[in-house]
Design a protein with these regions (language model features):
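Iron-sulfur-associated redox domains of electron-transfer enzymes in respiratory
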Residues: 30-147
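Cysteine-centered iron-sulfur cluster-binding motifs in ferredoxin-type domains/subunits
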Residues: 1, 6-26, 68-72, 148
Length: 148
């Protein structure tokens, strides 16, 4: 990646077009997607999309709840899983301490690191490097991510 976090061609591109087939950067055809995945008709007026159930929740810890963007549920869940020994850590996104205008994916293994990553980040955040780190680690890890 360059300094602006855009991919740099390294001379290994074979021009096969696989990357464009995986993520063409175009629109999602929601009517077709709804029919294929849910056998349901897509209604653009329904802002929720296809749902079976909706739940509302937040952590009991008020500090975690109000430090989050929308109630702190993900942060609270990660802290619970870490405390219970269900995970050894989580790949989360935080703001880069050296470049506070950029986000970065990190492997958080402590309460402080998980709390530091609270709130949603709507930024392009490369995560393959930190995902590769999991290859050398043993244990269970959570991944917090938003789809593209």
């Amino acid at each position: 990646f360059d300094e602006d976090r855009f991919p740099v061609l390294t001379g290994r591109c074979t021009e096969c077009g696989f990357c464009v087939r995986c993520c063409p950067g175009g629109d999602v055809d929601f009517p077709v997607l709804s029919q294929q995945l849910f056998a349901a008709t897509y209604d653009p007026a329904d802002l929720q999309g296809y749902t079976e159930n909706l739940f509302i929740s937040h952590p009991v810890d008020q500090a975690v709840r109000f430090a989050g963007a929308s109630g702190g549920l993900v942060t609270g869940l990660l802290l619970y899983l870490l405390a219970k020994g269900e995970i050894e850590g989580a790949i989360v996104v935080r703001m880069d301490p050296e470049k506070p205008y950029q986000s970065q994916a990190v492997l958080a293994t402590t309460v402080a690191e998980i709390r530091d990553a609270a709130q949603s980040k709507y930024c392009l955040t490369p995560s393959m490097e930190v995902l590769q780190e999991l290859r050398t680690r043993k244990g269970k890890f959570a991944v917090v991510a938003l789809p593209c």
